[in-house]
Swiss-Prot record:
Protein name from the UniProt record: ATP-dependent protease subunit HslV
GO biological process: proteolysis involved in protein catabolic process
Top-rank EC class of the record's enzyme: hydrolase
Gene from which this protein is expressed: hslV
Family stated for the protein in its record: Belongs to the peptidase T1B family. HslV subfamily.
Function recorded in the entry: Protease subunit of a proteasome-like degradation complex believed to be a general protein degrading machinery.
Length: 180
């Protein structure tokens, strides 16, 4: 059986609001859609943190658990938890094999965390990952820049995923949006 992959996650901080959106498609290999309603965006740490994944589903669940443990260990300090998780992820021979990326955010900070040790905070308050990530990122930047006073963070996140879903075959329109 081939690898199962999940696709597009988009996150935005906008006008004091924050939102994260993910589509629901899980694809096996390059040919078969196995699930349309996967939930790839989750609330962690008593609902104060949002986390979303793109990549191998089983690997992502492992990383969610590991990140949640780090959040508990560092009392909700998002940046410290992300850095410590990235160090552990990169430093462990078995964990390095995990194929997933995470976006994590709270009301003030948004970070991309990868297995190669990167913990990146965007300059513009927008991140997107997964096969449709570049499409969602482009759409989100345009929406934030040109329609910012008319749209909420939730509306920008949802619209960015809808545009990615129109373009990327690995992204569907079953969109889950979480807000903080």
């Amino acid at each position: 059986m081939g690898n199962f992959h999940a696709t597009t996650i988009f996150a935005v901080h906008h006008n004091g609001e924050c939102a994260m959106a993910g589509d629901g498609q899980v694809t096996m290999g390059n040919a078969v859609v196995m699930k349309h309603t996967a939930r790839k965006v989750r609330r962690l740490f008593q609902g104060k943190v949002l986390a979303g994944f793109a990549g191998s589903v089983a690997d992502a669940f492992t990383l969610f658990e590991m990140f949640e443990g780090k959040l508990e260990e560092y009392n909700g300090n998002l940046q410290r938890a992300a850095v410590e998780m990235a160090k552990q992820w990169r430093g462990d021979k078995m964990l390095r094999q995990l194929e997933a990326m995470l976006i994590v955010m709270d009301k003030t900070t948004m970070l991309l965390v990868s297995g190669t040790g990167e913990v990146i905070e965007p300059d513009d308050g927008i991140l997107a990952i997964g096969s449709g990530g570049n499409y969602a990122l482009s759409a989100g930047r345009a929406l934030k820049q040109y329609a910012s006073e008319h749209l909420t963070a939730k509306q920008i996140a949802k619209a960015s995923l809808e545009i990615a879903g129109d373009i990327c075959v690995y992204t569907n329109h079953n969109i889950i949006v979480e807000e903080l």
